[in-house]
Amino acid sequence: MMEMVLPVANATAAALARVSAVFNAPLARAVVFGIHIDGHLVVEGLLIAAILFQLSRKSYKPPKKPLTEREVDELCDDWQPEPLCPPIKEGARIDTPTLESAAGPHTTVDGKEVVNFASANYLGLIGNEKIIDSCVGSVEKYGVGSCGPRSFYGTIDVHLDCESKIANFLGTQDSILYSYGISTIFSVIPAFCKKGDIIVADEGVHWAVQNGLQLSRSTVVYFKHNDMASLASILEKLTHGNKHTEKIRRYIVVEAIYQNSGQIAPLDEIVRLKEKYRFRVILEESHSFGVLGKSGRGLAEHYGVPVEKIDIITAGMGNALATDGGFCTGSVRVVDHQRLSSSGYVFSASLPPYLASAAMSAVNHLEENPSVLANLRSNIALLHKELSDIPGLEIASNILSPIVFLKLKTPTGSAVADLELLEIIAEKVLMEDSVFIAATKRSSLDKCRLPVGIRLFVSAGHTESDIFKVSASLKRVAASVV
C-alpha cells in the first residue's frame, strides 16, 4: 500500500513546486498603472470570475419523466414502513379487569360483585347522594363543560367558589384549580423550577412528580426514601462552600403520604431543615388531603406545623373528595404566578363545573361529619392488625396511612419475578374470593427505586366484614404462593 502512495505524494509535491515557481517568476509578474501584480493575484482574479460565472448560470433541471405504473408498484412493494410505536414487551402487557359500576367499597368487576380495595375512595363518598345532587344541579345550570381554558372564557363562578372553599378550609391565602389531578404536580413544578435550579427530592416519589422534575430541567438530587439524615447530608453538601448558593432557587419536593410505599413524610423535620438551609418546600398531598389531621386538613395539621411554612401545596381531588381535578394552594403570589406560567392551567380546558361543585360538597361533608375520619382510621388499624402475621409478606406502610402497602419479606432479587408473584396473589384473591386488589405494576418510564408490592386502599365505607374478608383471603393465598 505504501509503495503506491509514495509515488503519488512525490508527484503532487513536484507539481505544486512548479506552479509556485511559475507564479513567482519575473515573467509571471506585470506592472499595470504602476502597480506590481504578482501571479497569485491573477489566480485570485480567475477564481472570482469562475464564481461569478457559476452564480449567473441557470440551475440545472433534470427532465421530468414520470414513473411508469410498474415502477410505482415496485416502489410500493419494496417500501417497509417503520412501526408507529415499538412492539409491546411481554412484561408490559396488562390485562386489566373491567369495572361495570362505580368504584365504591363494593363494585362489579367482569360481571362479578366484589369487595373493592383497589380504588382510592378514602372518605367513602363515591355514590353520596348530596354530592350527586350537587353535580346534577351544576349540569343543569352550566352544562357538562366550560369549552375553554380558564383565561379564555373558561372561568365560571363555581371555579372561584371552589378555590375559595379550599383556601379557607386549609387556612391558606389562595388556591388554584387544575383540570386533571395528575397534571397538577407536574405542571406546578416546572412553573417554579427552571434550568439551573436545584431540587432535592425523595427517591420514592410517584411518576407524576418524576415527570414534573424532568420537565423542569432543574438539577435533581435524590435522597433516601423518608430518611432525614440522608436529606440533611445532601442539603449540607449543596450549600456548604457554594458561593452562588444564595442566587440559585432551591426546593425540597416530597409527598405527604407516598403512593409507592404508604409512608408518611416527617414534615416537622423537613421544615426544620428547610429553614436551616434556606430551601423552599413543595408538598404533594393527594393521599393526605382529607385524611390526615384532626379535621382532615392534611400533613400540616397532623404535625401541628403552620401551613404558611409550606411554600407550595398540591393535591388531586380524586382520592378523598370523590371527584376529579386537582388544586395548588399557598400565598397569593404563588397562585397568581401559576395563572400565567403553569402549562396545565393555561393550556387546558377548565375543570367541568359539576366536578368543582362535587369538590365543594365533599369538603362540606367532611366539615359536617368529622366522624368519617374516625371510621377511616378504625378500618386502617383493623386491617393492620389482621395482616400483621400474613405469611411471606409484611406491611411497609404507616399505621395512619390509608394506603396499606404489602411487600415481600424475602424478595427474589428480581423486580420482574417479585411482581409476577404479587400479581398471582392479586389474581387468585379476585378469582377465588371476589376481593379486588392490585399489585404496583410500573411502566418503563417510572424511575421509582422502591420495591414493588400490593397496595390496598382503605375506605371509611368499608365494613368490618370487608376487612376480615380481604385479610383472610390474602393470608390463605399468600401462604400457597409465596
From Swiss-Prot:
GO cellular component: endoplasmic reticulum; endoplasmic reticulum membrane
GO biological process, alphabetically ordered: ceramide biosynthetic process; sphingosine biosynthetic process
Catalytic activity from the UniProt record: L-serine + hexadecanoyl-CoA + H(+) = 3-oxosphinganine + CO2 + CoA
Keywords assigned: Acyltransferase, Endoplasmic reticulum, Lipid metabolism, Membrane, Pyridoxal phosphate, Sphingolipid metabolism, Transferase, Transmembrane, Transmembrane helix
Xref: Gene3D superfamilies: Aspartate Aminotransferase, domain 1 (3.90.1150.10), Type I PLP-dependent aspartate aminotransferase-like (Major domain) (3.40.640.10)
Domain of life: Eukaryota
Pathway(s) annotated for this protein in UniProt: Lipid metabolism; sphingolipid metabolism
Record EC number: 2.3.1.50
Membrane-spanning segments: 33-53
Single GO MF annotation: serine C-palmitoyltransferase activity
Membrane topology: Single-pass membrane protein
Cofactor requirements of the protein: pyridoxal 5'-phosphate
Biological role: Serine palmitoyltransferase (SPT). The heterodimer formed with LCB2 constitutes the catalytic core.
SUBUNIT field: Heterodimer with LCB2. Component of the serine palmitoyltransferase (SPT) complex, composed of LCB1 and LCB2.
Similarity comment: family membership: Belongs to the class-II pyridoxal-phosphate-dependent aminotransferase family.
Record-linked PANTHER family: CLASS II AMINOTRANSFERASE/8-AMINO-7-OXONONANOATE SYNTHASE (PTHR13693), SERINE PALMITOYLTRANSFERASE 1 (PTHR13693:SF2)
Designated name of the protein: Long chain base biosynthesis protein 1c
Originating species: Oryza sativa subsp. japonica (Rice)
